[in-house]
Amino acid sequence: MAKELRFGDDARLQMLAGVNALADAVQVTMGPRGRNVVLEKSYGAPTVTKDGVSVAKEIEFEHRFMNMGAQMVKEVASKTSDTAGDGTTTATVLARSILVEGHKAVAAGMNPMDLKRGIDKAVLAVTKKLQAMSKPCKDSKAIAQVGTISANSDEAIGAIIAEAMEKVGKEGVITVEDGNGLENELSVVEGMQFDRGYISPYFINNQQNMSCELEHPFILLVDKKVSSIREMLSVLEGVAKSGRPLLIIAEDVEGEALATLVVNNMRGIVKVCAVKAPGFGDRRKAMLQDIAILTKGQVISEEIGKSLEGATLEDLGSAKRIVVTKENTTVIDGEGKATEINARIAQIRAQMEETTSDYDREKLQERVAKLAGGVAVIKVGAATEVEMKEKKARVEDALHATRAAVEEGIVAGGGVALIRAQKALDSLKGDNDDQNMGINILRRAIESPMRQIVTNAGYEASVVVNKVAEHKDNYGFNAATGEYGDMVEMGILDPTKVTRMALQNAASVASLMLTTECMVADLPKKEEGVGAGDMGGMGGMGGMGGMM
C-alpha cells in the first residue's frame, strides 16, 4: 500500500497538534474542581467520566499524523493506569508539557538526542527525590485520605476503602460490584471462600438459610471424580467412629458414591457434604493444594502415589467451621500451620512477579487473599445506571491508588511533591548545553500538574506556583477551598508510586517523540466516484420522461 511521509519540523508539528487536542480533553478532569467529560457510546446512554484514561481511550483522529501523536500519549495514560492504577491525567499533562517545551528547543536548533539525555537524567534525580520525601502509609486515616483524593474528593468512598482494608488486611482482595440501593455497602467474607456449592440439595442441614453448616469437620481433598463408594469406605468408617462431620472436595462426586453419601447423611450415620473442587486444570490442582495447606490436610492424588482406598484420617484436613451454600463454600479457621501458609503465600507472590498475563496475576492475587484470610466486597450504590458506572470507576481508581500508597508510601498532593522535587535539579549538570536545556525542560514541565489543578479551580496558576515554590516541605494550595497550608494536614495526599510512574512514563514517551525525524503513514484510500456510465444511464431516464 502507498505511504505518505512527513519529515522534521512538519512531522513534529502534526504530532504535537494531536497531543495538544488529546491533552486538552483530558486535562479538564484534573483536580478537585475538574469537570466531567461525556463520552458517546455506540449503544445505550453516554458515559459520564472524570477519569483521564477513560477519556484518552475514546479519542481517535481522522488525520493520521495527528492520530499518531495522540496514540503515543494515550499509551502514557494507559501504562500509568496499568502499573499505578491512577495518575493518568497527571501523566498526560506532563507528557504534553515536556513535548511543548522540547519542541521549542528542537526548533531552535538543539540536538534532540542530547535533550533526551538531559530529560532522562532529570527524571532520575526527581524520582530519587520523590522516594526520599515519601512517608509510609500505615494508618486507616491516611488510606482514607488517599482514597478520598483519588475518588474526586468523595469522603464516603475513601472511608469505605479504608474500612475494607482494615478488615481484610493490606493483601486482602477487595472487589467492587454494582449495589442494589442508593448507599455504598461493604460486606466481608472471612476465611477462604470459593465459588462451588453443594452437589446435592439433600446435604442441606440449615433449612432457614438453605445451607449446610459443619462444625469442626474433617476435609477430604481428592483430585479426581469419585463414583464408587468402595474407594471411600475406610475413610467414612474412620470419620463415623470419630463422630465429626466430613466435607468432601473432589473433581466430582456422582452415581453410587453420591447416593450412598446422601443416604448416610439423611439417616445421621455420617454428617457429610460434597462439593466440586474450584477452578479447572492446573489451577484446580493449585487451589486444592492451597486448601490442603490451609487445613493441614493432604490432596489425595494418584500423581503423588496416594490412592483414595489407602487414605486415613491423618490425610484429612480440619477446620473450625465450614458453611456451604448453593453457590459458595467458606472454610473458616483452617488448622494449617502459619509458617506453611506464609511459605505458600510467598511462593504464589513469586509467581505473580513472573507472570506476564494480567488475568493470571489477578487469579494469583485472589489465591493470596484467600490464604491470607478475607475478601471484602464494596457494593456501589447509585440512583441511575449512568451514575453507577461513573461512581464504580471512581471507586476502582481510589482502590488502585490506596494499594499504590500502601506499597510505596505517600507524598504531599496537589502537585506539591513535584515542585519540591525541583530542588534535586539545582545542582544537576549535563555534559553539554543541550543536556542542560533538557534538564530545564523537565524543571518547567513538573510545574504543569499544579498549574492545571489551579487553572481548573479558577485561580491564577503563576501566582500560586510562585507562592508555593517560596515555601518548604508540605506547604501547598488546596484548590477545593482556595486556601494555602500543610497539604498532609489538610488530607491532600498522593501515592508516591502514582506520581513516580506518571513522571517516568510521560518523560519516556515525550522524549521519544522529540527525537522523531520522520513519520510514515498509509495514504488515505481514494474513494472511487460513481462511474460516468452510471450517470449516462440516469440521463437515459430523462429520455424516458420525454416519451411519457
UniProtKB/Swiss-Prot annotation:
Class of this enzyme: isomerase
GO biological process, one term: protein refolding
UniProt keyword terms in alphabetical order: ATP-binding, Chaperone, Cytoplasm, Isomerase, Nucleotide-binding, Stress response
EC number from the UniProt entry: 5.6.1.7
Gene Ontology cellular component list: cytoplasm
Record's keyword annotation contains Transmembrane: no
Amino-acid positions noted as binding ATP in the UniProt annotation, renumbered to this chain: 29-32, 50, 86-90, 414, 478-480, 494
Family annotation (SUPFAM superfamilies): GroEL apical domain-like, GroEL equatorial domain-like, GroEL-intermediate domain like
PROSITE patterns: CHAPERONINS_CPN60 (PS00296)
Chief location bin: cytoplasm
Reaction equations catalysed: ATP + H2O + a folded polypeptide = ADP + phosphate + an unfolded polypeptide
A molecular-function term among this protein's GO annotations: unfolded protein binding
InterPro entries: Chaperonin_Cpn60_CS, Cpn60/GroEL, Cpn60/GroEL/TCP-1, GroEL-like_apical_dom_sf, GROEL-like_equatorial_sf, TCP-1-like_intermed_sf
Compartment annotation: Cytoplasm
Function description: Together with its co-chaperonin GroES, plays an essential role in assisting protein folding. The GroEL-GroES system forms a nano-cage that allows encapsulation of the non-native substrate proteins and provides a physical environment optimized to promote and accelerate protein folding.
Known partners and oligomeric status: Forms a cylinder of 14 subunits composed of two heptameric rings stacked back-to-back. Interacts with the co-chaperonin GroES.
Family, similarity comment: Belongs to the chaperonin (HSP60) family.
Alphabetical list of HAMAP family matching this protein: CH60
Protein name in UniProt: Chaperonin GroEL
Organism: Legionella pneumophila (strain Corby)
